[in-house]
Regions:
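Short, charged, surface-exposed secondary-structure boundary motifs
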Residues: 199-205, 296-303
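Nucleotide/phosphate-binding catalytic cleft detector across ATP-hydrolyzing
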Residues: 1-25, 32-167, 236-244, 256-260, ...
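Generic beta-strand/beta-sheet core signal
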Residues: 31, 182, 269-271, 291, ...
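Short hydrophobic/aromatic-enriched beta-strand-loop microsegments
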Residues: 188-192, 286-294
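Short beta-strand scaffold segments in enzyme catalytic cores
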Residues: 177-181
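Phosphate-binding glycine-rich/basic clefts of nucleotide- and phosphate-handling proteins
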Residues: 133, 137, 182-280
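Noncatalytic linker/hinge segments flanking ATPase motor cores
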Residues: 29, 67-78, 164, 187-194, ...
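Extended, H/D-rich, highly charged conserved domains that either
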Residues: 172-175
């Protein structure tokens, strides 16, 4: 398996784009792995020095500029550490104004109002400079409709569907589990730990002396309910210790308060993790739930069908990226002001 690097990701992107006929006709959504992008939904509060003066366009432009810089400066080192790069290689690529409050009250358009306290809610996406520089050699900037971190996009869409303030989303990969936190409208990557599909297949290799392909086939047989009750019970006992390591990883990232954790595995996860028997293993009040596409298709009234030739490896992440476009802020003028102010940060 090739190394998961900027160079290899760009090679794969180039091959994929070559398959799209009349590429120039389309807008592209970049939904990126946490290694290459970090999207944060948050807010910045500012105090106006002259609260009795009416807010005009120049004033709001200045406030947005202050908020963007303050947020960028506050998060740059943390984002760099998360993506394992130097802070000078953190690029701010996509800023959206999601809302504004004046003295604690939501306002669609602040121009013409007076206020002392201004709170600006936005989403900001940071990317690895080398990745973005390489991608712009493949596509013009105008071709890109949205850049987002996959896990945060999923958390945002799920928060819209569930209308809930607090939960975790966990993306499960071959070697790692990445956890995203939704907390009262604030969304971001929370943390990661080393556990994934390979831990399960290596376990079965140690116990049963079988190769990875056979191990995956056994898990599929068990997960699909095609095994005998006796085999399933013995198989779960074999998996128990390794799945406990997964549970411990989740607990290490959680506080001691009730929390639902929606699992989004990029492989077939043994369904026993969703049973009350497995959930009782937690020392903290955590509950594991499957991240079903029905959570969003039924809520938003979509009926999803793909061509037989389409190869979609993770449907929820695909739909989340698509739906993010639908939930972009309607006040494009505010986001335009924001992106105009970040140009000096993206070069």
């Amino acid at each position: 398996m090739p190394e998961f690097s900027v160079l290899n990701a760009l090679k794969e992107a180039k091959l994929l784009l070559k398959k799209i006929r009349k590429l120039e006709k389309y807008k592209i959504i970049l939904s990126l792995d946490s290694k290459f992008a970090t999207t944060v939904y948050s807010s910045i509060s500012l105090v106006r020095p002259h609260p009795k003066e009416v807010i005009d366009e120049a004033d709001i432009d200045n406030l947005i500029s202050q908020a963007i810089w303050r947020f960028f400066d506050r998060n740059r080192l943390k984002v760099a550490q998360k993506m394992d790069i130097d802070d000078v290689d953190v690029l701010l690529s996509d800023v959206r104004i999601r809302g504004i409050k004046l003295d604690g009250h939501k306002i669609v358009n602040p121009i013409g109002f007076k206020a002392k306290a201004v709170e600006i809610f936005f989403s900001q996406t940071f990317v690895v400079r080398d990745f973005m520089r390489g991608f712009r050699e493949l596509l013009s900037k105008d071709s890109i409709a949205l850049i987002t971190e996959t896990g945060t996009a999923m958390s945002h869409i799920l928060s819209r569907a569930l209308v809930r303030d607090r939960f975790f989303v966990a993306n499960l990969f071959p070697n790692q589990t990445s956890v995203f936190l939704a907390d009262s409208g604030r969304l971001s990557h929370h943390d990661s730990f080393d556990w994934g599909e390979n831990d399960l297949t290596h376990l079965l290799d140690r116990y049963l002396h079988i190769d990875q392909a056979t191990a995956k086939s056994l898990i599929q047989t068990y997960a699909n309910g095609n095994a005998s009750e006796n085999f399933s019970r013995r198989f779960e006992n074999i998996l128990a210790k390794e799945l406990q390591m997964f549970a411990n990883g989740l607990e290490s990232l959680s506080e001691n308060e009730p929390m639902d954790i929606y699992l989004n595995p990029f492989f077939l996860m043994p369904p026993v993790v969703f049973t009350s028997r497995f959930n009782s293993r937690f020392q903290k009040p955590l509950k594991l739930l499957p991240l079903s596409t029905n959570l969003i298709t039924e809520k938003f009234g979509y009926d999803v069908q793909f061509k037989k030739s389409a190869q979609v490896k993770n449907l929820f992440s695909f739909l989340a990226a698509f739906l993010e476009i639908n939930f972009l802020p309607q006040n494009d003028k505010m986001s335009h002001l924001a992106n105009r102010r970040v140009r000096w940060l993206v070069n």
